[in-house]
C-alpha cells in the first residue's frame, strides 16, 4: 500500500479512485491531480513508481488542504459561527439541521434517537 499525505492508499484500485480515500479529495479533484502530475488515472496504484507517488504527494501538499488541516479548518469555521451567535451557529450548538430543513417529522440523524416513552405499570 502506498502512503500519500499520511493515508494508506489501496494498491488494487485505480489511481483516480484511490486518491478519493484521502479526506478532502473527491473524484473531480482526483482527476485534476492526475492531469496536473501527468499520471494516467486508469493506472493501478501498485503500478506507480516511488517517483510518481512522491510527485502526487508533493502536488497535493502544495495545492490543497487535506486530512487534518482541512478538518481543523472546518471545525474552526463551525466554532466561529457558534461564537458570533448567528442562527447557523445556534443550530450547530443545538444539534439541529442547519440549512433550513423541516424538523417536525424528519431530521432523526441530526436530532439523535427518539427519547423512550416507557410508562410505569401500576
Curated annotation (Swiss-Prot):
Pfam families hit by this protein: Ribosomal_S13
InterPro entries: Rbsml_uS13_C, Ribosomal_uS13, Ribosomal_uS13-like_H2TH, Ribosomal_uS13_bac-type, Ribosomal_uS13_CS
Annotated stretches, region: Disordered: 97-122
Biological processes annotated in GO: translation
Cellular component terms per the entry's GO annotation: cytosol; small ribosomal subunit
Keywords linked to the UniProt accession: Ribonucleoprotein, Ribosomal protein, RNA-binding, rRNA-binding, tRNA-binding
Function: Located at the top of the head of the 30S subunit, it contacts several helices of the 16S rRNA. In the 70S ribosome it contacts the 23S rRNA (bridge B1a) and protein L5 of the 50S subunit (bridge B1b), connecting the 2 subunits; these bridges are implicated in subunit movement. Contacts the tRNAs in the A and P-sites.
Quaternary organization: Part of the 30S ribosomal subunit. Forms a loose heterodimer with protein S19. Forms two bridges to the 50S subunit in the 70S ribosome.
Protein name: Small ribosomal subunit protein uS13
Organism: Thermosipho melanesiensis (strain DSM 12029 / CIP 104789 / BI429)
Amino acid at each position: 500500500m502506498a502512503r500519500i499525505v499520511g493515508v494508506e492508499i489501496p494498491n488494487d484500485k485505480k489511481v483516480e479512485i484511490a486518491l478519493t480515500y484521502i479526506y478532502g479529495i473527491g473524484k473531480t479533484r482526483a482527476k485534476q491531480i492526475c492531469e496536473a502530475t501527468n499520471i494516467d488515472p486508469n493506472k493501478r496504484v501498485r503500478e506507480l513508481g516511488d517517483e510518481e507517488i512522491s510527485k502526487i504527494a508533493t502536488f497535493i501538499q502544495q495545492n490543497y488542504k487535506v486530512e487534518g488541516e482541512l478538518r481543523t479548518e472546518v471545525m474552526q469555521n463551525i466554532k466561529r459561527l457558534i461564537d458570533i451567535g448567528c442562527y447557523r451557529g445556534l443550530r450547530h450548538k443545538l444539534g439541529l439541521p442547519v440549512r433550513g430543513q423541516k424538523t417536525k417529522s424528519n431530521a432523526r440523524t441530526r436530532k439523535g434517537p427518539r427519547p423512550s416513552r416507557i410508562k410505569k405499570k401500576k
